[in-house]
């Protein structure tokens, strides 16, 4: 028996949350951005009127203003988005215990074993969810219904806003095959360009490629994309009971040549801290501690950790702490073979806290950095991991592979 999977995607989530406090702006073009006073800031989200003007997520403010001179800019409020995300997922949890969040504004639901309790009609259940989210929170969602996770996500992207799309056994080729290959889950800009060089521009064209050819071209990802394009995805929806609590998030890299200079160590720590912070944000987690590990050329391993005075998922804060630990730990110029950065003492986003600064300067700076890193996440989600990085020298890391712990 086929599974029944729903993918629920909040429409223009950041912008929609902000407009709850500004209902008078609902019919006007509005965008959420890091710093509305900076021309070179990045658009984090936009509402439908702004979208109709051609405004795009991850483009610069000045470019968006050129397209839409009347664009209204609002600053982000990340704690607000986290609160709504938690409430919305709680609604999903009333229909199945198999709810798997995918970022702050998307979730998969496996209703295979619970659908009969709610009428037995998957489309009707999707419409019920859309109605509840709109009535209870003033937000809209699009829902994809299918027999696997990949097609359910394609369905939620297929019609927006506030729509339900069913991709079933009898129509999936008609809907899926004409779509650009870049619409497929985990196909970033670099993968799309690589496939394009071989004449593969649609999911239908991808489905006709041999699995062996794709694996030769792209490694394990090629085999995965072959399965996705041919309706063979069987990945489970992991509910909270199936997901082991994440106790730490770490990344490491073993260098092809030993590091002996501090600027090389800085580059390595920064790259690792960026990867750790990005994963924390994706999981909706904050860390309350940081650990740095060093393996020298004699394969001796040293580590040091510290507890933070507040929880964070920001690269800058993790990186600053990791650099201090590395500086204390490393006995220069002892050659370094491996570096690792690990986030410890993890808490859910809604449980995080920050000590208050009486002048408010810490909170202001935190919001600005939240905006910067959210913008980077948006760029990477749209164009791929390598589209943007922090301004550190990475000559020593060229071609190095970052490993997840």
Model regions: which residues?
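Short, charged/polar surface micro-motifs in flexible loops or helix N-caps
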Residues: 13, 36-39, 297-300, 346-349
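Acidic, metal-coordinating catalytic segment for phosphate/diphosphate chemistry
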Residues: 310-405
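Gly/Gly-Pro- and Ser/Thr-rich, intrinsically disordered tail segments characteristic of DNA damage-repair
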Residues: 1-227, 237-240, 278, 363-405
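A glycine-rich phosphate-binding loop feature that marks nucleotide/adenosyl-phosphate handling sites
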Residues: 147-150, 230-231, 286-297, 336-347, ...
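Short small-residue beta-strand/loop micro-motif enriched in glycine and branched aliphatics
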Residues: 72-73, 300-304, 351-352
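Short, hydrophobic beta-strand segments
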Residues: 108-113, 303-306, 356-360
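DNA-contacting surface of Y-family translesion DNA polymerases
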Residues: 7, 183, 191-336
């Amino acid at each position: 028996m086929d599974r029944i999977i729903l993918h629920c995607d909040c429409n223009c989530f950041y912008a929609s949350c902000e407009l709850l406090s500004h209902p008078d702006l609902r019919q006007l073009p509005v965008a959420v951005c890091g710093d509305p006073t900076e021309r070179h800031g990045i658009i984090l989200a936009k509402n439908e009127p702004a979208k109709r003007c051609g405004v795009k997520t991850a483009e610069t403010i000045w470019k968006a203003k050129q397209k839409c001179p009347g664009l209204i800019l609002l600053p982000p409020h990340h704690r607000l988005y986290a609160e709504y995300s938690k409430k919305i997922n709680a609604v999903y949890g009333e229909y199945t215990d198999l709810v798997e969040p995918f970022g702050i504004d998307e979730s998969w639901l496996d209703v295979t074993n619970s659908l009969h309790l709610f009428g037995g009609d998957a489309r009707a259940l999707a419409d019920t969810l859309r109605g509840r989210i709109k009535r209870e929170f003033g937000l809209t969602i699009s829902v994809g219904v299918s027999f696997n996770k990949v097609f359910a996500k394609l369905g939620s992207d297929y019609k927006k806003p506030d729509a339900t799309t069913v991709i079933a056994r009898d129509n999936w080729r008609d809907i899926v095959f004409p779509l650009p290959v870049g619409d497929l889950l985990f196909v970033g800009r670099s993968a799309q360009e690589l496939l394009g060089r071989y004449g593969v521009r649609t999911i239908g064209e991808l489905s006709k490629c041999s699995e062996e050819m794709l694996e030769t071209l792209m490694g394990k990802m090629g085999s995965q994309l072959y399965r996705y394009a041919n309706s063979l995805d069987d990945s489970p929806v992991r509910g909270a009971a199936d997901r082991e609590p994440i106790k730490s998030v770490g990344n490491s890299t073993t260098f092809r040549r030993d590091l002996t200079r501090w600027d090389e160590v800085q580059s390595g720590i920064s790259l690792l801290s960026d990867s750790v912070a990005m994963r924390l944000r994706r999981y909706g987690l904050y860390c309350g501690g940081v650990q740095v590990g060093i393996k020298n050329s004699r394969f001796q391993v040293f580590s040091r950790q510290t507890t933070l005075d507040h929880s964070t998922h920001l690269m800058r804060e993790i990186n600053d702490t990791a650099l201090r630990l590395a500086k204390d730990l490393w006995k220069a110029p002892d050659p370094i073979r491996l570096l690792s950065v690990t986030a410890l003492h993890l808490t859910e986003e809604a449980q995080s806290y920050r000590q208050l600064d009486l002048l408010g300067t810490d909170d202001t700076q935190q919001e600005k950095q939240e905006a910067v890193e959210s913008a980077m996440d948006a760029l990477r989600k749209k164009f791929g991991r390598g589209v943007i990085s922090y301004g550190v020298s990475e000559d020593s890391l060229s071609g190095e592979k970052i490993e997840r712990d």
